[in-house]
Structure formats: C-alpha cells, structure tokens
C-alpha cells in the first residue's frame, strides 16, 4: 500500500506534463519508450543491476514486458518510475522515480540511466527531483534506495543525495544494501 497523500494533493493523471528540471523532463510512460528501454536493458552492465535475473534483455517481447511493468505500476499504484527524457533532444535517457511493488522493503526512489547518457549527472538530477516530488506528495519520513553492493556508480549517486546505508535485503535473489534518505535531513 502506498503512503497516504498529503492534504490537498492528487496523483498525476495520464495527461500530466511531468516534472521539469534544468536539463530533464520526468514523465509517465508511452508506447514509444518500449524500444529505448529495451535498448538500455540490452547492455549487460545495466541489466546486471536492473533486470530481475541480472541478464540483458534482448528479445523485443521481454523488453515490452519490462516496460509494461513500469507503466503498469502507474495504473496499479497511481505512481511509478518516470521516464527520463533529455530536454534538449527529447531522447529517452532512462527511468527514475518511485517504485513500491508488493513485498518491497519500503517506498523506493530508484534510478537507471542508459549507458550513453551516464557521466552527465542525470541520475542525481532526476533522483533529486523524484525525491522532492515524493516528499511533497506523500506523508513519508524516509525514502529508500535498494542498491547492489557492487554497484559503485549508484552508491555514489546515493551518497551525493545524502543517503546512508541503514540495512540490507535480498530482492529477487540479489543481496542489496538499503540506503535511506530521511525527510528531516533532506536538503532538496
């Protein structure tokens, strides 16, 4: 169950324009996102930390299924990971945002940026916007980030966000540290 909404807040509707940052647009999923999401997940280095089995997604049907899970999270929960679009080009750069499926250890803001867009600070920029939105929208004291112990780039993003390791979990058979961003320490 998602946390209670703050008083007077409503969840995004299908025509919601999204969140804009200096360089990015965070928005809901479209059919046109399936191919670039599949391309992102075909990279072994990306798939290792994002796909359920840690293997690259190379079959179009599996890419569609993964995108349907992301889009379906919005339908079933009213929230979900945003598609991250580069404002200057309109290109799909990844997915970042709230993720809270059944049996998850808490309300997460996660991130995954396509290989060709890494090193530009997009994960941090989009995650910061997602955390700001989540704290503004929900009655939350903390937001978690489940990060594989070998995923140094994601750990660096979490540190930059001010998150700290406060536990561990096993998700889909993979050990992960639970990084936590606390509302009362969040600088936004």
Language-model-derived ranges and their functions:
Residues 45-69:
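Conserved GNAT-fold acetyl-CoA-binding loop/helix
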Residues 68-83:
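A short helix-loop-beta-strand connector motif used in the catalytic cores of GNAT acetyltransferases and
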Residues 1-49, 79-188:
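Acyl-donor (CoA/ACP) binding surface of acyl/acetyltransferases
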